[in-house]
Amino acid sequence: MGDLMTGRILVAGVGNVFLRDDAFGVEVVRLLAERPQPPGVQIRDFGIRGVHLAYELLNGYDLFVLVDAAPRGEAPGTVSVLEVDMPGPEDPQAQPVIDAHSLTPDAVFGLLSSLGGHPGRSLVVACEPAEVDAGMGLTDPVRAALPDAVRAVEEILAEAIPGGRPGEGPEEGRAAEQATDEQECMADLATSR
């Protein structure tokens, strides 16, 4: 990924906590917010406030990481990291249909483009949902994917920022931290129930 110009990074979780696995992004950023982050990294829960997210991105970020549940035809709980190609202002995707309560990631990027914004590099850490019906709580396969998503975001940050883990160089302590990631995430989940 290389060095960032200003080091401003936004990691945004989106989703509806009342639609089971749609809450995946919200849960991941909740776990990340409890962990130390490198300077310049903002971890934010945008829930269903896609319009607010688009306006926040107008503030300028070198790297934007969106965490969301996204059906892609994979097995439930599969975590993927996707690079986003921003639509141009004339692109039909840049003319989103606005729903004040929720915007899909594509619509957020389209709204941002139509507002004249363009974050630096944009990535999506996506998880294949099992259920997005009305209900509270993640399904078992999606809950089990939380440590993988936390690790994916932390690896993105470590690659983007020299010494991207607090108090470490890029390689020091990485193996030990990865070994405990799953245990810490599961402990955090157990105490939040």
Please report, for each region that a protein language model flagged, where it lies by residue.
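Short, internal active-site loops enriched in acidic
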Residues: 129-131
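N-terminal catalytic or cofactor-binding beta/alpha core of small enzyme domains
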Residues: 2-127, 136-147, 152, 156-167, ...
